[in-house]
Amino acid sequence: MATTAMRMIISIIFISTYVTHITLCQNITEEFYQSTCSAVSRGYLSALRTGWYTSVVTIELSKIQKNVCNSTDSNVKLIKQELERYNNAVVELQSLMQNEPASSSRAKRGIPELIHYKRNSTKKFYGLMGKKRKRRFLGFLLGIGSAIASGVAVSKVLHLEGEVNKIKNALLSTNKAVVSLSNGVSVLTSKVLDLKNYIDKELLPKVNNHDCKISNIATVIEFQQKNNRLLEIAREFSVNAGITTPLSTYMLTNSELLSLINDMPITNDQKKLMSSNVQIVRQQSYSIMSVVKEEVMAYVVQLPIYGVIDTPCWKLHTSPLCTTDNKEGSNICLTRTDRGWYCDNAGSVSFFPQAETCKVQSNRVFCDTMNSLTLPTDVNLCNTDIFNAKYDCKIMTSKTDISSSVITSIGAIVSCYGKTKCTASNKNRGIIKTFSNGCDYVSNRGVDTVSVGNTLYYVNKLEGKALYIKGEPIINYYDPLVFPSDEFDASIAQVNAKINQSLAFIRRSDELLHSVDVGKSTTNVVITTIIIVIVVVILMLIAVGLLFYSKTRSTPIMLGKDQLSGINNLSFSK
């Protein structure tokens, strides 16, 4: 019997395991633009979350007497231990929902408090293993983000008097029903585990019989399996402060999740998309602890609604583009900062700057519009003409030429500068390419790894077509003397404006220097002219004086006849 039971357990585990088949992306094309050191990967289809679908999940609980058959039978002991774990799990869930005023104040403190709490809640979960813990508030955080706003709203309504009974009564004769809550919202409710009827009508009667013996170990195993789900749900809510993501198979099994997807008010194409990508759906879903009362545990499951599907998506990869002609330490660099996922959406483009928030399955891109920016379609011009006049492309600048590599969908961008050695290798042939200084690209065809210095990068092995678009690196158009550095959130227009300001300042400085030089030259000319005039005047005076003097010395004294006669007469008169 034990062997049969073990086979049953193995078969259940096998059936409930979700196996994903990894397929190669088809029709992926990649364009590398040498002028901007960027690459665009195309050929993807969208699956954009635009809304949430909330559903209430219930588990029927049972109030168990503490004194259950004091037999020494081994099977009964196992049952009693399992019942003790069950009781502790229920107590854990009840303590989770206590102290609501504290929850409201804690919700105001928000996500940092939640993160701090989760770090301190990863210790071994003793409460479900038979050791009673001190009562503490584990958290039912309200309003920690718009992502779970709709689920939290439904959870708050379930705390109102009569709401749980309304759900409980609706599920008396069925495992699934639509219930209209007091806030006017209709939600699909489902009962995934009925521990109450099983414990009250099947388990306890067997334990409390006249001889307190259980001859069949299968009874113990069956209860352990049913109880294990409750224990795991309690553990998840406990260590995650009442809100968990992704959605585990304990919260909803695959069959339950597929059934819920089928009941969602969406198109058949959307249902098909979600059903074929269950693991992605789980990653983007939440479960929110609600209430434990009236022998019912209720929690909200919040699933994504992909309102935009099958529109084209592309991913932009960027790497630093630097000059290579200048001396070490004097180079300038420019990097496009608009990297991320882009998807067409109703005449515009949804941009997801944090690419890691999007999940890729084959050639399907699952993104949350809550993490997106809406841009005009002209943003595509940045790939082919970064200096276009219709859209101001985003860049950052620096004067630090750091070598690095960016792995793309079907290749790698390599920014290699200075004395760094950069190579591409094949696992069988070794180094097949050595990169020179600058920005370059290599496809994954025949390439397994890219090495930049001491860092090794493994390229993706997806199939696709790569196109190398050559062009003059735009960084060469800029003058290092006026290039602005450390602009982390700028655009082409802003950088050009700063360059123009610098050039205008230089021109103004030159003009001022020129005007000063001209003034000095004029003054010097005047002074020189005056000096020359003075010297000329002096020279002229000297020349006139010398001329007069020389004429005076060279002219003989002429005596008149009277003077001569008088002299003669005088001489004769003696």
UniProtKB/Swiss-Prot annotation:
GO terms for biological process: entry receptor-mediated virion attachment to host cell; fusion of virus membrane with host plasma membrane; symbiont entry into host cell; symbiont-mediated induction of syncytium formation. Residues 551-574 are cytoplasmic. One of its GO terms (cellular component) is host cell plasma membrane. Belongs to the paramyxoviruses fusion glycoprotein family. The lineage of its organism: Viruses, Riboviria, Orthornavirae, Negarnaviricota, Haploviricotina. Glycans are attached at residues 27, 70, 120, 500. Residues 1-25 form the signal peptide. Residues 26-524 are extracellular. The record marks 109-110, 136-137 as: Cleavage. Residues 76-96, 158-209, 481-516 form a coiled coil. The chain crosses the membrane at residues 525-550. This is Fusion glycoprotein F0. Disulfide bonds join 37-439, 69-212, 313-343, 322-333, 358-367, 382-393, 416-422. Residues 137-157 are annotated as: Fusion peptide. The keyword Transferase does not apply. Keywords: Cleavage on pair of basic residues, Coiled coil, Disulfide bond, Fusion of virus membrane with host cell membrane, Fusion of virus membrane with host membrane, Glycoprotein, Host cell membrane, Host Golgi apparatus, Host membrane, Host-virus interaction, Membrane, Signal, Syncytium formation induced by viral infection, Transmembrane, Transmembrane helix, Viral attachment to host cell, Viral attachment to host entry receptor, Viral envelope protein, Viral penetration into host cytoplasm, Virion, Virus entry into host cell. Pfam families: Fusion_gly.
